[in-house]
């Protein structure tokens, strides 16, 4: 079996590390001689947590030891295209302390907690700490965005410049809720969260998302989300006493 995929979207502002379509929707191609029929495109939602159970089943190894993912061998070996498993009609997305670039008064690195649900038509996002900067603080040069000519161009813009809105979309603080019509707006450029036309849809998606998060024991659903900011940071910590700008 040969699997071709990617771990995240492009290393550009508002993509890598961000919960927008191009940040988490990655390619996934499988070749398995004699098992997978070519020329098919499957619409079922799968996540990286589903890959290990799938590979174990393909190798005929019992993987029933606490994995959260579910094998999608049935999708690979099916001869159908489109939606195969009706239960795989959405994906839950979670972000916590993925990045660096923001800290509390003690210099402890803080995360940017997000939960989201993606369906065929919609992406609904909840930003639990909208008072924080989503890709790191300005004084630390937005450290959760990789350095690149694109980042340099955007951070060099000033209010009133022609492209300044792209700076705001990439680096500015975000609202508590975001809602995108994926088919019409695949790049997630127009937040519809304040559009009353979609309030009922958003409420329905939030309830579905939170029910699933409660079922899986997400601490943030039980008022214990701040625990994620208290774990020791094991990587190379940023010296928050040195402001970049």
Describe the role of every protein-language-model region:
Residues 20-21, 100-193, 243-245:
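C-terminal, low-complexity/hydrophilic appendages and adjacent surface loops
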Residues 1-5, 28-30, 47, 54, ...:
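Structural recognition of the beta-strand scaffold that forms the well-ordered cores
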Residues 14-66, 70-86:
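Substrate-binding rim/cap in mid-to-C-terminal beta-strand-loop elements of soluble/periplasmic
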Residues 70-76, 80-112:
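Polar, glycine-rich mid-to-C-terminal structural blocks
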Residues 8-9, 35, 187:
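Catalytic metal-binding/acid-base residues of hydrolase active sites
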Residues 33, 58-63, 76-80, 121, ...:
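A generic secondary-structure signal for well-formed alpha-helical elements
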Residues 25, 160-177, 182-245:
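Long, internal low-complexity/basic segments
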Residues 1-14, 59:
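Metal-dependent active-site segment of extracytoplasmic phospho-/sulfohydrolases and closely related
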């Amino acid at each position: 079996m040969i699997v071709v995929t990617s771990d995240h979207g492009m290393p550009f502002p508002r993509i890598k590390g961000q919960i927008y379509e191009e940040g988490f929707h990655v390619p996934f191609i499988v070749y398995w001689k004699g098992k997978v029929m070519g020329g098919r495109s499957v619409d079922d939602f799968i996540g990286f947590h589903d890959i290990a159970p799938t590979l174990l089943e393909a190798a005929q190894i019992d993987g029933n030891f606490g994995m959260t993912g579910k094998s999608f061998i049935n999708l690979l070996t099916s001869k159908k295209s489109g939606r195969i498993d009706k239960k795989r009609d959405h994906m839950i997305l979670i972000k916590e302390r993925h990045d660096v670039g923001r800290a509390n008064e003690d210099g402890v690195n803080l995360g940017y907690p997000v939960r989201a649900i993606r369906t065929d038509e919609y992406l609904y996002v909840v930003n639990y700490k909208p008072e924080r900067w989503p890709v790191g603080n300005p004084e630390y040069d937005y450290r959760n965005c990789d350095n690149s000519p694109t980042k340099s161009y955007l951070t060099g813009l000033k209010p009133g410049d022609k492209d300044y809105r792209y700076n705001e979309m990439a680096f500015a603080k975000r609202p508590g809720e975001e809602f995108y019509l994926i088919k019409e707006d695949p790049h997630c450029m127009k937040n519809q969260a304040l559009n009353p036309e979609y309030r009922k849809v958003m409420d329905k998606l939030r309830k579905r998302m939170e029910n699933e998060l409660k079922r899986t024991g997400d601490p943030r659903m039980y008022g214990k989300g701040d625990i994620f900011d208290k774990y020791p940071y094991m990587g190379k910590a940023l010296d928050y006493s040195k402001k970049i700008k």
